[in-house]
């Protein structure tokens, strides 16, 4: 488009189009203002010139000529085209703001960001400055007018989030990785260590004296390197901070431990630091002040597995993400809707009172982000549409599954970075593919502070391991080489958060006591692919790597779908997924078992660190009622030689209870335990491969398999009942006789949380409050007699055993907490005599498989036997 110039053309245009006069006059009299801001004089001038449009054309000509002298390109200003923009927008310059970010090492980073820039722009600048690629675990925080910490939303403009004039931010960890060893790069672990050290110093991560010393020694090793007698003299750690109340005794203990580390690089020291810190009860818990319905001050903690409730620094409840149907807030109230249990009809809503509306919204956002990051495979897109009920806020970053996949693709040399006060080993050594074993001092338990979500059952018992306790199971961990199944199923790897490894020791102690009770010296923690000599090692010996060569962490294997370690199977045709070598070894071991005539209890050490069903913390009161008709009470505690003399040549390897764990229907599997999976229902078909797949799932619970010969003269009618306390008392006469003997086989190997309440047989142990009930079901009973080949789960032979199961569930609510007692009565009958010890142990094992989170408190057995033909002949003769 061309523009006419000169006085004649301007006069002509001004006379023809008088509406252009106000615009030209306004352009002359109004100073240039920033874009988006209108000067008040402009509006007044426009209004004045519009009302009085009687000025001659020569005045506009003079004004426009004056504008030509003042600015270039005025011809565009006088063109009548509506497509032309004002000169203010043409001359617009983007304004920038100075951002000051406090990093994790207490240094500050300043940068210029566009004033209308989004939070993601600033976050990317900080991560680029830090040379950080695994940045999804981190975030930026700022303080509002109430000095409350808020997370900077990367999808919104910065100026709309922060109101204060100086833009000050802090770079912190937003999502604490459940397993820091899976981080790919040393620099990521280094910044995580800095965050944890800051949490410990400020008291947000409480721990004991021993833990302070252990973590402090690794921090010193990472910063100062190996101990040097010439350089490190006196109290050389006094300048470093390790605890909120640092004492001389703590510093001396740290120096003693530091002297023992030789040749440990800073990267290795940081890995040991993180391996211990992740077991702390408050690791990764974001606390928020609130009040409950009664107005009592509580703390709401948000973590990877769900929502935690604390009162007086003690965790009183836990709601896992799969149990939460909906989270919402209204004004200053925060609500969570809980999924109904198996025996409940409606959902329940729990409300909390927060200090103000902003606090409720802040907590709601944190819950949304944590749930999306740790539980979902990909972030949920925000709702679209003009009218949308509720907030449109959604987490917009990458989830943990996506960031692990992206981290596996990182292929760059280990970045160089200088640690805070490091005097040696400043070059970060890449640990990709390297294996390390944690020293004995790492096996410390941390019970200080509120109970965290990874330690669900052991925290109530209050046990504390020493830092050099036996039984530490730690196998090598690979850092960079992530297996495909670990990447594609990230949610299953979350399950290991629920229980730490100290639960393993309690189960081992239970096995030891069971071993003494049954006079069996060879009760061991057994791996499927070990040879028999290694299976006879002590239970405290560490586990060997898995056959596949994958990193075998007891906490991680509970969530991954691997083969079961149960050995209750006779020699049979190899299943498609089994190995030829494994099958041969299994047959040889079966022969050894039957030859020794021993009651061997097989258990896998990693199966003890199983994640419990997310929010189910009730315990079961199992009553196996023992009443003997037609014979005197037979002592369960008699030694194995006595049992061996009563045995005949007929042999069996026990009953295999195929199980089907039913959970609430959800798009998400339980974050800490029973999961809805297509593999769970595999036992409904009678083919052998499906049955094998069900056995492969039993690794996620404590597996207890028992082999024994059958007693010819007795038929066992075993009833594992689950009932109310009144029903338990109904079987008290027989229960009292049973509990006078020490057959702790029934409960000692299954109890994980409470004290030994089995020796007293009067009543049940104290209940653990839990919000919901466990949903389980026994689908089929598969008898395996002798060496017959299992062809159908319903195959009937002359020796087939039949069962009938009756379940009673009693639930009481006290003070907002529900107590659940399940009494399950199992009656086993058959044409063949049944080994009472074997059937009892298998019944208890099946109960534990169905209710992994609940405690078996009582087991009593009724035994009914029909008189033998000789006895029938004797009775008429005597009469």
Swiss-Prot record:
Any single GO BP term: cortical actin cytoskeleton organization
Region entry Spectrin--actin-binding, spans: 483-541
Modified residues (Phosphotyrosine): 343
Tissue specificity annotation: Highest expression in brain, lower in heart and kidney. Within the brain, highest expression in cerebellum.
Polar residues bias spans: 718-728
InterPro entries recorded: Band_4.1_C (IPR008379), Band_41_domain (IPR019749), Ez/rad/moesin-like (IPR000798), FA (IPR014847), FERM/acyl-CoA-bd_prot_sf (IPR014352), FERM_2 (IPR035963), FERM_central (IPR019748), FERM_CS (IPR019747)
FERM domain location: 97-378
Start and end residues of each stretch annotated as C-terminal (CTD): 744-879
Modification Phosphothreonine, positions: 30, 79, 475, 550, 580, 685
Residues with Phosphoserine modification: 75, 378, 430, 437, 461, 466, 510, 540-541, 544, 546, 564, 578, 639, 648, 650, 665-666, 671, 677, 684, 721, 782, 868
Listed Pfam families: 4_1_CTD (PF05902), FA (PF08736), FERM_C (PF09380), FERM_M (PF00373), FERM_N (PF09379), SAB (PF04382)
GO MF annotation list: actin binding; signaling receptor binding; structural molecule activity
GO cellular component entries: cytoplasm; cytoskeleton; parallel fiber to Purkinje cell synapse; plasma membrane; postsynapse; postsynaptic density; presynapse; protein-containing complex
The keyword Protein biosynthesis is assigned to this record: no
Composition-biased stretches (Low complexity): 17-35
Protein name stated in the entry: Band 4.1-like protein 1
Source species: Rattus norvegicus (Rat)
Gene: Epb41l1
């Amino acid at each position: 488009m061309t523009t006419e110039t000169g006085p004649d053309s301007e006069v002509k245009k001004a006379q023809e189009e008088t509406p252009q006069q106000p615009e030209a006059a306004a352009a002359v009299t109004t100073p240039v203002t920033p874009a988006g801001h209108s000067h008040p004089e402009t509006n007044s001038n426009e209004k004045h010139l519009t009302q009085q449009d009687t000025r001659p054309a020569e005045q506009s000509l003079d004004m426009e000529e004056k504008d030509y002298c003042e600015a270039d390109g005025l011809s565009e200003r006088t063109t009548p085209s509506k497509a032309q923009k004002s000169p203010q927008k043409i001359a617009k310059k983007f304004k920038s703001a100075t951002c000051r970010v406090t990093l994790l090492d207490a240094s500050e980073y300043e940068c210029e960001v566009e004033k209308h820039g989004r939070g993601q722009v600033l976050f990317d600048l900080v991560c680029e400055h830090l040379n950080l690629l695994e940045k999804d675990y981190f975030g930026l925080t700022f303080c509002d007018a109430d000095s409350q910490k808020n997370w900077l939303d990367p999808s919104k403009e910065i100026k709309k989030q922060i109101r204060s004039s100086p833009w000050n931010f802090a770079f912190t960890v937003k999502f604490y990785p459940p397993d820091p060893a899976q981080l790919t790069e040393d620099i990521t672990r280094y910044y995580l260590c800095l965050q944890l050290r800051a949490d410990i110093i400020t008291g947000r991560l409480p721990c004991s004296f021993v833990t302070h010393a252990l973590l402090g020694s690794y921090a010193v090793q990472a910063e100062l390197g190996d101990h040097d007698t010439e350089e490190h003299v006196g109290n050389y750690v006094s300048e470093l901070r390790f605890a909120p109340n640092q004492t001389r005794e703590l510093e001396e203990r740290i120096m003693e431990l530091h002297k023992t580390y030789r040749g440990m690089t800073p990267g290795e020291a940081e890995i040991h630091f993180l391996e211990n810190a992740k077991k702390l009860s408050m690791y990764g818990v974001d606390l928020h002040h609130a009040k409950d319905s009664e107005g009592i001050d509580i703390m709401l903690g948000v973590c990877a597995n769900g929502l935690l409730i604390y009162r007086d620094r003690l965790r009183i409840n836990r709601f896992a993400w799969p149990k939460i149907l909906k989270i919402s807030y209204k004004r200053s109230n925060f609500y969570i809707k809980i999924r109904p249990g198996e025996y409940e009809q409606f959902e329940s809503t729990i409300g909390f009172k927060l200090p103000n509306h902003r606090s409720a919204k802040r907590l709601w956002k944190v819950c949304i982000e944590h749930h999306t990051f740790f539980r979902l495979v990909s972030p949920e897109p925000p709702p679209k549409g003009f009218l949308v009920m509720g907030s449109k806020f959604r987490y917009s970053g990458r989830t943990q599954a996506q960031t692990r996949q992206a981290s596996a693709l990182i292929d760059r040399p280990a970045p160089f970075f200088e640690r805070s006060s490091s005097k040696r080993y400043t070059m970060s050594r890449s640990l990709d593919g390297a294996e390390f074993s944690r020293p004995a001092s790492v096996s410390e338990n941390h019970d200080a502070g509120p109970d965290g979500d990874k330690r669900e059952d052991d925290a109530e018992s209050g046990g504390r391991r020493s830092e050099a306790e036996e039984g530490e199971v730690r196998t090598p961990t690979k850092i960079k080489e992530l297996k495909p199944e670990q990447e594609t199923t990230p949610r299953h790897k979350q399950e290991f958060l629920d229980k730490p490894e100290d639960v393993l020791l309690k189960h081992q102690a239970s096995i030891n006591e069971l071993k003494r009770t049954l006079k069996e010296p060879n009760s061991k923690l057994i791996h499927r692919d070990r040879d028999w000599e290694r299976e006879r090692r002590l239970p405290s010996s560490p586990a060997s790597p898995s056959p596949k060569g994958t990193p075998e962490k007891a906490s991680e294997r509970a969530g991954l779908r691997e083969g079961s370690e149960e050995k209750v199977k006779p020699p049979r045709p190899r299943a498609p997924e089994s190995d030829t070598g494994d099958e041969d070894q299994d047959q040889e071991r079966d022969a050894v078992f039957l030859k020794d005539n021993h009651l061997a209890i097989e258990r896998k050490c990693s199966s003890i660190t199983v994640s419990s069903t997310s929010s189910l913390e009730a315990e079961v009161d199992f009553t196996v009622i023992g009443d003997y008709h037609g014979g005197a009470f037979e002592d369960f505690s008699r030694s194995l030689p006595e049992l061996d003399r009563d045995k005949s040549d007929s042999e069996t390897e026990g009953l295999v209870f195929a199980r089907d764990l039913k959970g609430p229907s959800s798009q998400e599997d339980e974050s800490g335990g029973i999961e809805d999976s297509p593999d769970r229902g595999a036992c409904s078909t009678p083919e052998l491969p499906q049955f094998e797949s069900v056995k492969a799932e039993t690794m996620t619970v404590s597996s207890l398999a028992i082999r024994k010969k059958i007693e010819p003269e007795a038929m066992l009618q075993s009833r594992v009942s689950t009932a109310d306390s009144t029903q338990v008392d109904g079987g008290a006469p027989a229960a009292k006789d049973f509990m006078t003997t020490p057959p702790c086989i029934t409960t000692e190997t299954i109890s994980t949380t409470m004290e030994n309440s089995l020796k007293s047989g009067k009543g049940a142990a104290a209940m653990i409050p839990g919000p919901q009930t466990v949903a389980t079901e026994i689908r089929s009973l598969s008898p395996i007699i002798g060496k017959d080949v299992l062809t159908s789960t319903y195959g009937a032979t002359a020796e087939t055993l039949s069962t009938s199961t009756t379940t009673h569930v009693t639930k009481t609510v006290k003070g907002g907490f529900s107590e659940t007692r399940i009494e399950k009565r199992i009656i086993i009958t058959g044409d063949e005599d049944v080994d009472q010890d074997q059937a009892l142990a298998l019944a208890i094992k099946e109960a534990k498989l169905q209710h992994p989170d609940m405690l078996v408190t009582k087991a009593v057995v009724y035994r009914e036997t029909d008189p033998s033909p000789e006895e029938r002949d004797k009775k008429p003769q005597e009469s």
